[in-house]
Swiss-Prot record:
Source species: Homo sapiens
Gene: FUT2
Lineage: Eukaryota, Metazoa, Chordata, Craniata, Vertebrata
Enzyme class: transferase
Enzyme Commission code(s) on record: 2.4.1.69, 2.4.1.344
Matching PANTHER family: GALACTOSIDE 2-L-FUCOSYLTRANSFERASE, GALACTOSIDE ALPHA-(1,2)-FUCOSYLTRANSFERASE 2
Name under which the protein is recorded: Galactoside alpha-(1,2)-fucosyltransferase 2
Cytoplasmic side: 1-14
Subcellular location: Golgi apparatus, Golgi stack membrane
GO molecular function per UniProt: alpha-(1,2)-fucosyltransferase activity; fucosyltransferase activity; galactoside 2-alpha-L-fucosyltransferase activity
Alphabetic keyword roster: Blood group antigen, Glycoprotein, Glycosyltransferase, Golgi apparatus, Lipid metabolism, Membrane, Signal-anchor, Transferase, Transmembrane, Transmembrane helix
Length: 343
């Protein structure tokens, strides 16, 4: 059957168009009102569950961070401590931008960065840490915790040693530069079979240790004993010396065996070269300070360190426990405290 379609009514078309237009305008206004309301809402920190230890890694609640103070060795200690304590307590860890700027050019660190603009809006609970692990640190309350202090002790993170070593893996170009230098070294015309990194901390410690902490820095006698310790145990070796007092080292380290090279540049503001050289060696001689401690920790092998370098009544021993700083398998050589006793 043929159906004849009537032409669309002109008034009806206008009516439908009017309804469509009004409906569209109303819908758009409602959407804009919702968007504006979202913009006007204050940024809030979400209310988080206190049972985060039972959650998976992707569900960790809260935010923990740590102060970024001191130079390279200090900030490595702060990073590793934050890494370990956050994992122990089931909280996500974030590092300050300043710490990232110090560590990221050298190491393949993985913790996310907390920028200062964000950090300033968080109601932090400051939590001071001693320089050694305490039982109470296994159960730290609070979702937004900022650690303070200078923690640098294997007692915090040694149970995660492989993970810490992974975090402090050198970038390829940093490692290769150090290895290229070491490959070019010779002892009496032949390539050495054993490399011993030597770090001599001087700088401000030369004055701070005796005047503030009733202590000493490494002297000529200690370094001679440390070098001889390795010479008695290894053949075909070379000592790779780095220091922030290289002129003193050149005058006080015996080079008559032909097995000592003064390699580091001693520039504290850019320590990557010296640190990389030390960690690419097989063994370590350190004096005092976190730079040497971390070099020895990452290197492995045998480590000789300066022991008993303060008087028994030193205030330094209230904030520093030698047994928490030096691994049990490391070998200490006692410092000569006689210069302190003369005053």
């Amino acid at each position: 059957m043929l159906v004849v379609q009537m032409p669309f009514s002109f008034p009806m078309a206008h009516f439908i168009l009017f309804v469509f237009t009004v409906s569209t305008i109303f819908h758009v206004q409602q959407r804009l009102a919702k968007i504006q309301a979202m913009w006007e809402l204050p940024v809030q920190i979400p209310v988080l569950a206190s049972t985060s230890k039972a959650l998976g890694p992707s569900q960790l609640r809260g935010m923990w961070t740590i102060n970024a103070i001191g130079r390279l060795g200090n900030q490595m200690g702060e990073y590793a401590t934050l890494y370990a304590l956050a994992k122990m307590n089931g909280r996500p860890a974030f590092i300050p931008a300043q710490m990232h700027s110090t560590l990221a050019p050298i190491f393949r660190i993985t913790l996310p960065v907390l920028h200062s603009a964000t950090a300033s809006r968080i109601p932090w609970q400051n939590y001071h840490l001693n320089d050694w692990m305490e039982e109470e640190y296994r159960h730290i309350p609070g979702e937004y915790v900022r650690f303070t202090g200078y923690p640098c002790s294997w007692t915090f993170y040694h149970h995660l040693r492989q993970e810490i070593l992974q975090e402090f893996t050198l970038h390829d170009h940093v490692r290769e530069e150090a290895q290229k230098f070491l490959r070019g070294l010779q002892v009496n015309g032949s390539r050495p079979g054993t490399f011993v990194g030597v770090h001599v901390r001087r700088g401000d410690y030369v004055h701070v240790m005796p005047k503030v902490w009733k202590g000493v820095v490494a002297d000529r006698r200690y370094l001679q004993q440390a070098l001889d310790w390795f010479r008695a145990r290894y053949s075909s070796l070379i000592f790779v010396v780095t220091s922030n007092g290289m002129a003193w080292c050149r005058e006080n380290i015996d080079t008559s065996h032909g097995d000592v090279v003064f390699a580091g540049d001693g520039i504290e503001g850019s320590p990557a070269k010296d640190f990389a050289l030390l960690t690419q060696c097989n063994h370590t001689i350190m004096t005092i300070g976190t730079f040497g401690i971390w070099a020895a920790y990452l290197t492995g092998g045998d480590t000789i360190y300066l022991a008993n370098y303060t008087l028994p009544d030193s205030p330094f021993l209230k904030i520093f426990k030698p047994e928490a700083a030096f691994l049990p398998e490391w070998t200490g050589i006692a410092a000569d405290l006689s210069p302190l006793l003369k005053h």
